């Protein structure tokens, strides 16, 4: 790892981030980072333990003169989203993140950076290690598996935490203070299909959709970005309708909370239609590229011939699945009527897999209104059940209802305005912060979320602003010294 990362200011923050990013920490595979964090806490002589689900808690007493302040919980999640470009050779299970400086940004070579939520975790580590930063009594809460199920937050029991104020460090714009967030639910459709013999006189093709930006399926869902699964399905729908295309297999998207950037489909077409099919596809490709020319300038759609496969998908099942995906809502479903520019409800068709007689379609539906969340989830369920799929609604977690009378909110607003000569944006976000879940068992805890500027989270374009990290660090230090008295 380049020494240039460790030389960035504030060094305490960037050095801890570099230490953390040397440890592989995929969601649901956090064993190494859990041990890393426990060893870190123990090495400082601080009370360190894990709960039943393996969240790590480290307690640090108040510094002299701060004993009369309310105890705080500083919270971040240990896992990170693992995404890489198709041509990047990298093993997230064994390798640390390869970071570099690009102007005002810290990036990773061909992969996600892990600033979500690594910079938040590194902040807490730096505070725990410090000897000269005034602060009240701190409980550091490092949760597991935030990115693929909110498992740590959902299974944290009441009575473990003693703090009265929670500072969540998982917001990704430094001029925002978050006081609310969306809940979510996974919608997973599955079914089997029979494989049929390839008709005589067929030609094989591989269709590849790539070059899309991808991004966070909550925070970026309103940016007009392309969804590789929906684009691929549009191509398949047209070719099936006009030329009788048959699907061999599809592999689209990866993670439920990332807007899919790539999809690959193997198909066959009758040789007698091949020339007309290619001509028609090129026209549709040109149309799609024109539609996305502003938001997706690097979109690439390629069709190349391949060896003829042995089997193809059952035509009846294929038609149903293609039509269901076409009908399934993707993107913003409803904007909030209560907060300007806030997405209320959305869906991301994250994963489409067709292979070896098995179909899987995975969606993540989000909403800040619980009833609207289930309304859209049931609409999706209905579309897929109509074509013979079994549909599971799972992993539901609640949103976080804003408290505009929060005491800690007033503290943060005053500090931000004093430091930056402007008011912060007090917002709710269309993402799954853990605050809403934690508030279920700790309803009296005063919660707030903020953080440094991070762009492109959940994609290989993820980057963290160096100047923003400096601004954010000063903000954190001032907050710690101004926590309200008990």
Can you annotate each of these PLM segments?
Residues 104-107, 147-148, 154-366:
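Midchain, well-structured core segments that form catalytic/ion-binding scaffolds
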Residues 3-105:
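Acidic/His- and Gly-rich active-site-bordering loop/insert found
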Residues 78-80, 141-149, 171-174, 213, ...:
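Acidic, glycine-rich active-site loops and adjacent beta-strand->loop/helix elements
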Residues 9-10, 337, 344-346, 350-359, ...:
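Zn-dependent metallopeptidase/amidohydrolase metal-coordination segment
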Residues 220, 227-229, 234-250, 402-445:
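Active-site-adjacent substrate-binding region
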Residues 342-431:
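Substrate-recognition/cap regions that form aromatic- and gly/pro-loop-enriched pockets
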Residues 66-148, 153-164, 201-204, 315-318, ...:
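Active-site metal-coordination/substrate-binding segment of hydrolases
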């Amino acid at each position: 790892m380049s020494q240039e990362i460790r030389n960035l200011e504030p060094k305490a923050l960037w050095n801890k981030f570099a230490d953390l990013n040397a440890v592989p920490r995929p969601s649901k595979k956090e064993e190494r980072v859990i041990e890393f964090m426990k060893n870190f806490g123990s090495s400082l002589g601080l009370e360190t333990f894990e709960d039943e689900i393996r969240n790590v808690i480290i307690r640090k007493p108040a510094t002299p003169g701060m004993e009369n302040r309310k105890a705080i919980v500083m919270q971040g999640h240990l896992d990170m989203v693992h995404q890489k470009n198709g041509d990047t050779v990298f093993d997230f299970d064994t390798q640390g993140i390869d970071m570099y400086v690009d102007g005002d940004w810290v990036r990773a070579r061909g992969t996600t950076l892990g600033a979500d939520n690594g910079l938040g975790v590194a902040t807490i580590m730096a505070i725990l290690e410090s000897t000269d930063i005034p602060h009240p009594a701190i409980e550091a809460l490092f949760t597991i598996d935030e990115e693929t199920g909110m498992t740590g937050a959902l299974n944290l029991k009441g009575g473990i935490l003693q703090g009265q104020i929670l500072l969540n460090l998982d917001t990704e714009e430094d001029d925002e203070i978050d006081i609310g967030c969306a809940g979510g639910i996974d919608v997973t459709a599955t079914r089997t299909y029979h494989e049929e013999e390839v008709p005589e006189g067929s030609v094989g093709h591989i269709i590849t959709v790539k070059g899309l930006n991808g991004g966070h399926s909550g925070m970026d869902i309103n940016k007009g970005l392309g969804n590789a699964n929906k684009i691929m399905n549009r191509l398949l729908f047209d070719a099936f309708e006009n030329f009788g295309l048959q699907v061999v297999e599809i592999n689209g998207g990866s993670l439920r909370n990332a807007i899919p950037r790539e999809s690959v489909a193997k198909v066959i077409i009758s040789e007698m239609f091949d020339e007309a099919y290619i001509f028609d596809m090129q026209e549709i490709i040109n149309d799609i590229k024109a539609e996305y020319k502003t938001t997706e300038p690097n979109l690439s759609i390629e069709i190349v011939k391949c060896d003829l496969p042995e089997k193809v998908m059952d035509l009846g099942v294929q038609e149903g699945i293609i039509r269901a995906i076409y009908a399934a809502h993707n993107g913003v479903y409803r904007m909030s009527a209560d907060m300007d520019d806030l997405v209320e409800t959305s869906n991301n068709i994250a994963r489409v897999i067709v292979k070896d007689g098995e179909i899987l379609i995975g969606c993540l539906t989000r909403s800040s209104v619980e009833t609207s969340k289930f309304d859209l989830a049931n609409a999706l369920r209905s579309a897929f059940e109509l074509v013979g799929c079994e549909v599971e609604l799972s992993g539901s977690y609640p949103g976080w209802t804003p408290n505009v009378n929060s005491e800690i909110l007033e503290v943060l607003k005053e500090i931000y305005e004093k430091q930056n000569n402007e008011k912060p944006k007090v917002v709710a976000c269309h993402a799954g912060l853990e605050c809403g879940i934690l508030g279920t068992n700790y309803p009296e805890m005063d919660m707030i979320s903020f953080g440094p500027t991070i762009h492109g989270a959940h994609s290989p374009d993820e980057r963290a602003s160096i100047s923003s990290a400096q601004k954010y660090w000063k903000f954190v230090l001032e907050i710690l010294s101004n926590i309200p008295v008990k």
